[in-house]
Amino acid sequence: ELSSKSHHSSLHKKAGFDWECYHRLYKFIKKGGYEVVHAHVGSIPYILLSAMLLRKVKFVATIHSEARREAGRNIMKWSRFIMFQHHKCTPVTISDESKVSFDEYYKMDAPMVYNGVPQYSAKCMAPLVDNNDQLLFIHPASCQKVKNQELLIKAFAKLVKDYPNVKMLWLGSNETFKSLYDTLVPDMVSQFKYVGTVPNVRDYLAQADAMCLSSKMEGMPMTIIEAFSVGCPALCTPVGGILNMIEDGKNGMLSASLSVEDYYLMLKRFCKLPSEQKKQMRLQAKESFAKYSIDNTAKGYLEVYK
């Protein structure tokens, strides 16, 4: 939801790369008289013209994942190099892992600001479990290849043979890659439920025993920060900035690799924990949220904007 102080405008970008967006964005920024322009992901190359011509404007770009992959190819890649290395745009990394990859790839130093979310306000919601002894897992991610749902679904199918009283709820859109979703459905056991998009993922995470990510690549997932904010441990693959967020056995767990077998073994390891250890893991997940508060994120970016 947008704050009343925020405004949404569309540049009516065409599908694929849209050369006209360079000029439209330049005119939009110039007319608005903005002091700071902050770009993310696919919008970064489109600020090139504006960054070269509008010298009184501070341009900032957040790098959300591993630098080489995030840069892409051709114009996506060289536009970043031009802006960053000629100091036309300030790059910001979001984790220790992403900073290392950025510094090595671009041969320059970049500031780091952790992602953050506001404190969670508990809401009354019907129980999501079918019985008091059931373990509840939440998978908060849209359906796409990089999120690697195939691994999660197959690993969970193995888990239910050992622990049938478990439940996985998949929260996220399947509309963009509907054909991919259709190929995954046959492997979903009855305890694996697709819910779709929900207004507030944290209402679900607050009831979960753990959240699960099986990604092939990540920067610093907001979903893990959201999980920590409600004291929900994260069970993830060992990729990207996740390695800087999760201490195995403390605020969550990491699989040994990106194989189905290793992810299954991690899930099984969590299920075998005594209830007291699961409770302790929840407390440590909550404690981990401290450095990911939105207040710290805001302070970090205000320093960058100076």
Language model regions located:
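Conserved acidic donor-binding segment of nucleotide-sugar-dependent glycosyltransferases
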Residues: 248-249, 253-260, 269-275
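Short His-centered aromatic/hydrophobic patch
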Residues: 39-46, 63
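N-terminal strand-loop element at the rim of the active site
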Residues: 1-19, 98-103, 174-177
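Short hydrophobic beta-strand element within catalytic cores of glycosyltransferases
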Residues: 233-236, 246
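Glycosyltransferase donor-sugar binding loop
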Residues: 140, 167-180, 194
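Conserved donor-binding/catalytic core segment of Leloir-type glycosyltransferases
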Residues: 129-147, 153-156, 169
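Aromatic "clamp/platform" in nucleotide-sugar-dependent glycosyltransferases that forms part
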Residues: 197, 216
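A short, well-ordered alpha-helix in the C-terminal region of glycosyltransferases
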Residues: 262, 276-291, 300-303
